[in-house]
């Protein structure tokens, strides 16, 4: 749905009420096809460089805004592609500061995606 560039610029590719194809074959807490029930937020970067302060600030603002507009969302369910599709995805990767986001949102992240069934369709 969204991309947060390294300078904090926000780019929306897909409206939130539509399905975005960010997760692919994936499973979260026993439920496959994460694209059907999630909002995707990508951060520009690589597995080899830390994310910027601007990205974290924008991410925090986006999450707070989404939770206000969609009361059924919970920060307790925030997780990475690497957790819902670990054999295919590596993002946000080892340089993502989960403790920083956890402290900002007042929850323990990343959410536990549960056991992964590599045969699950998505």
Predicted regions and their residues:
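Basic/polar, cationic surfaces and motifs that engage anionic cell-wall
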Residues: 32, 47-122
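Active-site-adjacent loop/helix surface patches within enzyme catalytic domains
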Residues: 1-72, 76
């Amino acid at each position: 749905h969204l991309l947060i560039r390294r300078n904090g610029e926000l780019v929306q590719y897909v409206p939130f009420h539509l399905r975005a194809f960010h997760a692919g074959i994936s499973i979260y807490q026993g439920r496959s096809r994460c694209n059907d029930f999630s909002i995707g937020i990508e951060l520009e970067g690589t597995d080899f460089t830390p994310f910027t302060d601007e990205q974290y600030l924008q991410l925090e603002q986006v999450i707070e805004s989404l939770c206000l507009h969609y009361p059924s969302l919970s920060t307790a369910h925030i997780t990475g592609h690497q957790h819902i599709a670990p054999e295919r995805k590596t993002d946000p990767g080892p340089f993502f500061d989960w403790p920083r986001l956890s402290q900002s949102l007042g929850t323990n992240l990343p959410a536990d995606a549960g056991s992964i069934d590599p045969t699950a369709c998505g």
